[in-house]
From Swiss-Prot:
Disulfide bonds: none annotated. One of its GO terms (molecular function) is glycerol-3-phosphate dehydrogenase [NAD(P)+] activity. The lineage of its organism: Bacteria, Fusobacteriati, Fusobacteriota, Fusobacteriia, Fusobacteriales. The gene is gpsA. GO terms for cellular component: cytosol. HAMAP family: NAD_Glyc3P_dehydrog. This is Glycerol-3-phosphate dehydrogenase [NAD(P)+]. NADPH binds at W12, K106, A140, R255, V279, E281.
Length: 335
């Protein structure tokens, strides 16, 4: 029995804890919020972030980080991307050397453009952690119910990747492996920005044609920027790129799409965030993506317009119109 602690008590953290518990492992969940931890202990569910999905009674819940981390074989970091650095700093003095850490947050740090695993390794370098990433088209609402789902795990070495594949995989949760950590993380971060665009189109009551165009041209932007940042192009057309993009653009489970819908309906950014009432990772990743595109000289017109709607109060319909009247282009640069 492997001892695992899930650091973060949001929907994704709870869903993964339930999954890993089903796989026969010993589970602890850590919550930053003492009140939320007490509610989880009593009600065995997070009624706000993942309602009606119950934690087994033998999954331990704590708000004490040292208690959560002590003597654990694996730590799963399931906190929002903006909290990865602060949580990593908090782990610095309490984790063991060579601790296995699996990041499941999706995002890029705004100022540095670092991936989540880059941040973890930077903050914990003195402990030489074994860091990996798990990503893919995987809404917590479905994983928590055992609905068939596929993901990808990636680490710096094949041995750790295969070990974690066995830890997470079961008949309802199929895990593939990849050597491309950079591509896996960038795909997971940037798809949230395109999902905001898809939601905006839905909020404007545009149709399936528009959605198909945004997904297809969106994955082109993701892959172009991702390759420039060091990822492999094939990764962006797999589960952690195109697969994650499709589910995030199409599903009502997607908080990024829901936020986009509200923006398309004329709500302000603050109003949309308040109504979604969960972290909308694409908002943070949008700024990072724009910074990265300027750094690497990559054209990302959809992501540029999303930034304009988010941070410059640009009218959503006007943003879509500007995408449609851009200069004529080849679809694929092969002529």
């Amino acid at each position: 029995m492997v001892k695992i602690s899930v650091i973060g008590s949001g929907g994704w953290g709870i869903a993964l804890a339930i999954l890993l518990h089903k796989n026969g492992h010993n589970l602890t969940i850590w919550s930053f919020d003492k009140k939320e931890a007490e509610e989880l202990k009593i009600n065995r569910q997070n009624k706000t972030k993942l309602p009606n999905i119950l934690l087994p009674e033998d999954i331990k819940v704590t708000d004490n980080l040292k208690e959560a981390v002590d003597n654990k074989d694996i730590l799963v970091l399931a906190v929002p991307s903006k909290a990865i650095r602060s949580v990593s700093k908090s782990l610095k003095d309490i984790i063991k050397d060579n601790q296995i850490i699996v990041n499941v947050a999706k995002g890029l740090e705004e100022d540095t453009l670092k991936t989540m695993t880059d941040i973890i390794e930077e903050e914990l370098k003195e402990k030489n952690p074994q860091v990996a990433v798990l990503s893919g088209p995987s809404h917590a609402e479905e994983v928590g119910k055992g609905i068939p789902t596929t993901c990808v795990v990636s680490a710096h070495n094949k041995e750790l990747t295969l070990y974690l594949q066995n830890i997470f995989m079961n008949p309802s949760f199929r895990v593939y492996t990849s050597p491309d950590m950079i591509g896996v993380e960038i795909g997971g971060a940037l798809k949230n920005v395109i999902a905001l665009a898809a939601g905006i189109a839905d909020g404007l009551n545009y149709g399936d044609n528009t959605k198909a165009a945004l997904i297809t041209r969106g994955i082109k932007e993701i892959s172009s920027l991702g390759v420039a940042m060091g990822g492999e192009q094939s990764t962006f057309y797999g589960l952690t790129g195109l697969g994650d993009l499709i589910v995030t653009c199409a599903s009502m489970h997607s908080r990024n799409r829901r936020a986009g819908i509200l923006l398309g309906q004329g709500k302000t950014l603050d109003e949309a965030i308040k109504e979604v009432n969960m972290v909308v990772e694409g908002i943070y990743s949008a700024k990072s993506a724009l910074m990265a595109a300027k750094k690497y000289n990559v054209e990302i017109p959809i992501i540029e317009q999303v930034n304009a709607v988010l941070f410059e109060n640009k009218n959503a319909a006007e943003a879509v119109n500007e995408l449609m009247i851009r200069d004529k282009k080849l679809e694929i640069q092969s002529w």
